[in-house]
């Protein structure tokens, strides 16, 4: 088996396990994918979502930051990190991320507008 086949196999298995809500097993598959392909942006994104579901905020943030290092224009990672910062009452960082998202948004423009209102409302409290 060549490594190209193994890479996509691990990623696909991770997605299937994630869809079945087998998060620990999915996490392992995405980590295997990263061993073969350290720049697997989507694997890090899936890991961030898994850590969100497992309420491991530090690991979620770590993986979102990695996604953004690999692809500074990944709208989903920027949005999710802005939401994470908002949940921890870091309004300033959330606003900075949301402004960044608004400058590049393509798929997340509606969510960007909703998040802007949410940040403004929560930061007034």
Model-assigned labels for residue ranges:
Residues 32-33, 66-67, 100-101:
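Canonical positions in the second alpha-helix
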């Amino acid at each position: 088996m060549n490594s190209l086949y193994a890479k996509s196999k691990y990623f696909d298995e991770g997605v299937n396990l994630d869809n079945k809500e087998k998060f620990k097993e999915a996490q392992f598959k995405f980590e295997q994918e990263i061993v073969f392909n350290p720049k697997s942006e989507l694997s890090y994104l899936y890991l961030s979502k898994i850590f969100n579901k497992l309420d491991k905020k530090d690991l979620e943030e770590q993986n979102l930051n990695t996604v953004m290092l690999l692809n500074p224009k990944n709208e989903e990672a920027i949005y999710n990190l802005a939401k994470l910062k908002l949940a921890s009452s870091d309004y300033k960082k959330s606003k900075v991320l949301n402004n960044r998202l608004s400058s590049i948004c393509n798929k997340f423009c509606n969510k960007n507008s909703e998040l802007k209102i949410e940040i403004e409302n929560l930061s007034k409290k």
